[in-house]
Swiss-Prot record:
Induction description: Up-regulated by cAMP and follicle-stimulating hormone.
GO MF annotation list: 3',5'-cyclic-AMP phosphodiesterase activity; 3',5'-cyclic-GMP phosphodiesterase activity; 3',5'-cyclic-nucleotide phosphodiesterase activity; ATPase binding; beta-2 adrenergic receptor binding; calcium channel regulator activity; cAMP binding; cyclic-nucleotide phosphodiesterase activity
Protein's name in the database: 3',5'-cyclic-AMP phosphodiesterase 4D
Post-translational modification, as annotated: Isoform 1 and isoform 9 are rapidly activated by PKA through phosphorylation. Long isoforms that share a conserved PKA phosphorylation site in the N-terminus are also activated.
Residue numbers bearing the Phosphoserine modification: 137, 294, 296, 343, 370
Biological pathway: Purine metabolism; 3',5'-cyclic AMP degradation; AMP from 3',5'-cyclic AMP: step 1/1
Subcellular locations according to the entry: Apical cell membrane; Cytoplasm; Membrane; Cytoplasm, Cytoskeleton
Keyword annotations of the record: cAMP, Cell membrane, Cytoplasm, Cytoskeleton, Hydrolase, Isopeptide bond, Magnesium, Manganese, Membrane, Metal-binding, Phosphoprotein, Ubl conjugation, Zinc
InterPro entries: PDE4_UCR, PDEase, PDEase_catalytic_dom, PDEase_catalytic_dom_sf, PDEase_CS
Cofactor binding summary note: Binds 2 divalent metal cations per subunit. Site 1 may preferentially bind zinc ions. Binds 2 divalent metal cations per subunit. Site 2 has a preference for magnesium and/or manganese ions.
Reactions catalysed, as given in the entry: 3',5'-cyclic AMP + H2O = AMP + H(+)
Length: 803
C-alpha cells in the first residue's frame, strides 16, 4: 500500500494540500504529526478502514482501465495479503458515498467506474444533490413541530425512521478527509500486544494507514458490524445472489452481479477462506460479549487496556512521567482506591454529629429586594464599564471568549452576565416565560455559591463552560437538532455543574471520610452535591426560573440536567468517550450513515459529551487563556497537596508543589484525555471543529517545547541512583471483562526511579508512531547510551521524595 500511495499523483484540486496548478502535493506543515503520502492517493477510492489485531482482509485494488465501447471487464481479484504482522484491516465505503447514497457496503470495489466518478466528483466539488439544506436539520415536516418528547420520542409528523424521510433527518456523518492530515490519538493504535506491535503498524504509519480518505474504525461493535457486512457481501458474490433485491439492512445501489465462471477456482477458494476467517473473528468477538454489558462497554474496556499500556510506558521514563501517569490513571479511569483513612480530629467529630437533614453549603442570600423589571441593568449587573463590557460580549458566540476580562469588567459576575446574555441571545426568556428579575436573582444567588477563594473551580470556570456549551450548541452540524428544552437543560447544567466546589477532589473527600462522601456513598460525590445545591437554590425567594414550565417539562429538564452533570465526573471519562465513539462508528458502518438521534439515550449522550468537552476545553482555547487556566488548576492542586501533607496523608499525584512537572502534565493530559475526546467530537460534527483541533495541536506543541530537556546524569549520579531506588509504581486495571488475556491483565510494568538531586525532566508522551516524543539528537544519543549501561533507570525530577 505504501507503493500505491507514493506512485499515484494527487488529483488537481482534490485536496487542500494540492496546489492549484497541477497534481503536485504540498508538504504538510512541520507541526502536523502525519506523513505526507496521503496527499498522493487518488480520491476515486474513498473507504473506511477498520482496525482489529488478528487478521487482515486485502484492500480493493484501483479500478482497471476500461476499453472504449465495450462493457466493463469483470471486477479485479483482491491482491495478496500484506506481510505478516500487519494490522488487521476492514474496508467499508466512504462517508461521502455513504451519505450520498445512504449506505454502500465494503464491496464497493465491485461498483462501476461511473459510480466511483460520481463519488469522486461529490467529494471534490462538494456537490451533493439532496443535501442543499443544513446538514443536520430535521425534515421540513418537523420545522413546525420539531419538538422531541423526552418520554415518548419524536413528536407527531414524519418519523425520522420513515424511508421517505430526506437524508437531513438527523445528524449526517461526514467523510473526514481533512482529519486524515492530523495525528490521531492513541485509540488508533493496534490493540495487539504492545511490546510486539512495531511502529510501522501504528495508525499513523504510511504502510498501515497513510492513505487519503481513510477512516479507521476502532470500536469493537462497529468492527463486528462491518465484518458481518463483509461476510454478507462475500457470500452474495460467491453464491451469485447479487441480483437479489437489496434489503433495508444492506442496500446495494447498482451493484453488478458477479459470474462465478469469471473467477478462477483458486481465487474462489481464497475468497471463501477469507470469508470464513472473517466470520470466525466475529464469532470470537461476540462470544466475549456478556448479556449484562452494553456493546459500548467493549470499547470502554479496550480503551482502558490501551491507555493502561501507554501510561505504563510513560511511567517507566522518569519520575515526572510516573507522576503524570498516576494522575491520569487515578482521575480518569474510575479506579477503586484502597486508602488508610486518617483518624478524625475532635473538631471533625463534633461537626459530624450534626444532622444530615439539609443540603450543606446553601446560604441564605437576598438579591430580590433590590431588583425589579424596570431597573435591571443591560447585562444583569451594575458596572461602570458597560460599554467596554458590551464590546467584549460581542464575542459571546465565538470560541475563545476572554472570560477573565469579562469577570474583571462585571465586578466578578461573569456567570450572571454570560448566562443573561445567552438567554437573551437564544430568546429563552420569552420561550419559557422566565421573568428577567427572577433569572437575575437566581443567577446572582447561584454565583454567590461558587467559592471565590477556589482558584479553578469557581464562577469564572462555570461561566467559561456555559459559554463553550453555547458555542458547541450553535455549531452548524447541530443546527435544529436539539429542542429549546434540551438547549435550556444543557446551559442550565453547565451553569450549576461545579457550584459550591470546595477545591478538592472526590477522592480527597472519600479519603477524609467527609460528610459529603457519606451522604452520597462515595459515588460522584461532588457532582451529586452540585446538582443538589443547584436545584435547591430554585426554591429560594424569587429564584424559580422554571416556574412557568409544565410539570412534564420540569421533569424532563431535571432528568436531563442530572444526567449531564453526573457525566462531568472525570472518572467516567473513558466510559463516556467509548459510548460516543461506538455510536459514531456504528452509524458509519451501517446502511444509513445518518445518526438519527430519535431516542432519549442517543440525544442525552451527545449532550453529555458536549458539556464534557466544554468542561475539558481549556487546552483548545487561545494559548493566553489556556496558560491562565493551567496556572489556576495547578494552584488548586497544590493547595490540596498542602492539606494532605498537613494531615499526614499520601499526597495525590500532581498535587505536590515541590516536584510536579506542570509542562509534562499538560502534554500528557492532552495526549491521553483531551485529544481523544475532541477528536471523537470532531468526527461527530465534521468539519465544524477543525479549528478547535488546530488550536489544540498548537497548544500542545507549545507546552512540549517548554519542557526542559534532560542531560544525561554523571556516572557517579547513575551509581547513586542504582543504590537509592525507591518503591516501584505499577498500574493495574480491573475490567469487567471475562476472558481477558493474561498479557492484558499483567500489562502494567514497574518503574525504577533515580533519587539524584537533578532538576532535569525527560519528555515522554505519545507520538504519531510511538509513545515517546524524541528529544534533540544529542540528548537522544546520550539517553540511548545511558539505557545500555543501566536499563530502565529513570531520571529524577528533583531531590524531593516521590509521592
Amino acid at each position: 500500500m505504501e507503493a500505491e500511495g507514493s506512485s499515484v499523483p494527487a488529483r488537481a484540486g482534490s485536496h487542500e494540500g494540492s496546489d492549484s496548478s497541477g497534481g503536485a502535493a504540498l508538504k504538510a506543515p512541520k507541526h502536523l504529526w502525519r506523513h505526507e503520502q496521503h496527499h498522493q492517493y487518488p480520491l476515486r477510492q474513498p473507504q473506511f478502514r477498520l482496525l482489529h489485531p488478528h487478521h487482515h482482509l486485502p484492500p480493493p485494488p484501483p479500478p482497471s482501465p476500461q476499453p472504449q465501447l465495450q462493457p466493463p471487464p469483470p471486477p479485479p481479484l483482491p491482491p495478496p495479503p500484506p506481510p505478516p504482522g500487519a494490522t488487521r484491516g476492514r474496508y467499508a465505503s466512504s462517508g461521502a458515498s455513504r451519505v450520498r447514497h445512504r449506505g454502500y457496503s465494503d464491496t464497493e470495489r465491485y461498483l462501476y467506474c461511473r459510480a466511483m466518478d460520481r463519488t469522486s466528483y461529490a467529494v471534490e466539488t462538494g456537490h451533493r444533490p439532496g443535501l442543499k439544506k443544513s446538514r443536520m436539520s430535521w425534515p421540513s415536516s418537523f420545522q413546525g413541530l420539531r419538538r422531541f418528547d423526552v418520554d415518548n420520542g419524536t413528536s407527531a409528523g414524519r418519523s425520522p425512521l420513515d424511508p421517505m424521510t430526506s437524508p437531513g433527518s438527523g445528524l449526517i456523518l461526514q467523510a473526514n478527509f481533512v482529519h486524515s492530515q492530523r495525528r490521531e490519538s492513541f485509540l488508533y493504535r493496534s490493540d495487539s500486544d504492545y511490546d510486539l506491535s512495531p511502529k510501522s503498524m501504528s495508525r499513523n504509519s504510511s504502510i498501515a494507514s497513510d492513505i487519503h480518505g481513510d477512516d479507521l474504525i476502532v470500536t469493537p461493535f462497529a468492527q463486528v458490524l462491518a465484518s458481518l457486512r463483509t461476510v454478507r457481501n462475500n457470500f452474495a458474490a460467491l453464491t451469485n445472489l447479487q441480483d437479489r433485491a437489496p434489503s433495508k439492512r444492506s442496500p446495494m445501489c447498482n451493484q453488478p452481479s458477479i459470474n462465478k465462471a469469471t473467477i478462477t477456482e483458486e481465487a474462489y477458494q481464497k475468497l471463501a477462506s477469507e470469508t470464513l476467517e472473517e466470520l470466525d473473528w466475529c464469532l470470537d468477538q461476540l462470544e466475549t460479549l456478556q448479556t449484562r454489558h452494553s456493546v459500548s462497554e467493549m470499547a470502554s474496556n479496550k480503551f482502558k487496556r490501551m491507555l493502561n499500556r501507554e501510561l505504563t510506558h510513560l511511567s517507566e521514563m522518569s519520575r515526572s512521567g510516573n507522576q503524570v501517569s498516576e494522575y491520569i490513571s487515578n482521575t480518569f479511569l474510575d479506579k477503586q482506591h484502597e486508602v488508610e483513612i486518617p483518624s478524625p480530629t475532635q473538631k471533625e467529630k463534633e461537626k459530624k454529629k450534626r444532622p444530615m437533614s439539609q443540603i450543606s453549603g446553601v446560604k441564605k442570600l437576598m438579591h430580590s429586594s433590590s431588583l425589579t423589571n424596570s431597573c435591571i441593568p443591560r447585562f444583569g449587573v451594575k458596572t461602570e464599564q458597560e460599554d467596554v463590557l458590551a464590546k467584549e460580549l460581542e464575542d459571546v458566540n465565538k470560541w475563545g471568549l476572554h472570560v477573565f476580562r469579562i469577570a474583571e469588567l462585571s465586578g466578578n459576575r461573569p456567570l450572571t452576565v454570560i448566562m443573561h446574555t445567552i438567554f437573551q441571545e437564544r430568546d429563552l426568556l420569552k420561550t419559557f416565560k422566565i421573568p428577567v428579575d427572577t433569572l437575575i436573582t437566581y443567577l446572582m444567588t447561584l454565583e454567590d455559591h461558587y467559592h471565590a477563594d477556589v482558584a479553578y473551580h469557581n464562577n469564572i470556570h462555570a461561566a467559561d463552560v456555559v459559554q463553550s456549551t453555547h458555542v458547541l450548541l450553535s455549531t452548524p452540524a447541530l443546527e435544529a437538532v436539539f429542542t429549546d428544552l434540551e438547549i435550556l437543560a444543557a446551559i442550565f447544567a453547565s451553569a450549576i455543574h461545579d457550584v459550591d466546589h470546595p477545591g478538592v477532589s472526590n477522592q480527597f473527600l472519600i479519603n477524609t471520610n467527609s460528610e459529603l462522601a457519606l451522604m452520597y456513598n462515595d459515588s460522584s460525590v461532588l457532582e451529586n452535591h452540585h446538582l443538589a445545591v443547584g436545584f435547591k437554590l430554585l426554591q429560594e425567594e424569587n429564584c424559580d426560573i422554571f416556574q412557568n414550565l409544565t410539570k412534564k417539562q420540569r421533569q424532563s429538564l431535571r432528568k436531563m440536567a442530572i444526567d449531564i452533570v453526573l457525566a462531568t465526573d472525570m472518572s467516567k471519562h473513558m466510559n463516556l468517550l467509548a459510548d460516543l465513539k461506538t455510536m459514531v462508528e456504528t452509524k458509519k458502518v451501517t446502511s444509513s450513515g445518518v445518526l438519527l438521534l430519535d431516542n432519549y439515550s442517543d440525544r442525552i449522550q451527545v449532550l453529555q459529551n458536549m458539556v464534557h468537552c466544554a468542561d475539558l476545553s481549556n487546552p483548545t482555547k487561545p494559548l493566553q487563556l489556556y496558560r491562565q487556566w493551567t496556572d489556576r488548576i495547578m494552584e488548586e492542586f497544590f493547595r490540596q497537596g498542602d492539606r494532605e501533607r498537613e494531615r499526614g496523608m499520601e499526597i495525590s499525584p500532581m498535587c505536590d508543589k515541590h516536584n510536579a512537572s506542570v509542562e509534562k502534565s499538560q502534554v500528557g493530559f492532552i495526549d491521553y484525555i483531551v485529544h481523544p475526546l475532541w477528536e471523537t467530537w470532531a468526527d461527530l460534527v465534521h468539519p465544524d471543529a477543525q479549528d478547535i483541533l488546530d488550536t489544540l495541536e498548537d497548544n500542545r506543541e507549545w507546552y512540549q517545547s517548554t519542557i526542559p530537556q534532560s542531560p544525561s546524569p554523571a556516572p557517579d549520579d547513575q551509581e547513586d541512583g542504582r543504590q537509592g531506588q525507591t518503591e516501584k509504581f505499577q498500574f493495574e486495571l480491573t475490567l469487567e471483562e471475562d476472558g481477558e488475556s493474561d498479557t492484558e491483565k499483567d500489562s502494567g510494568s514497574q518503574v525504577e526511579e533515580d533519587t539524584s538531586c537533578s532538576d532535569s525532566k525527560t519528555l515522554c508522551t505519545q507520538d504519531s508512531e510511538s509513545t515517546e516524543i524524541p528529544l534533540d539528537e544529542q540528548v537522544e544519543e546520550e539517553a540511548v547510551a545511558e539505557e545500555e549501561s543501566q536499563p530502565q533507570t529513570g531520571v529524577a525530577d528533583d531531590c524531593c521524595p516521590d509521592t
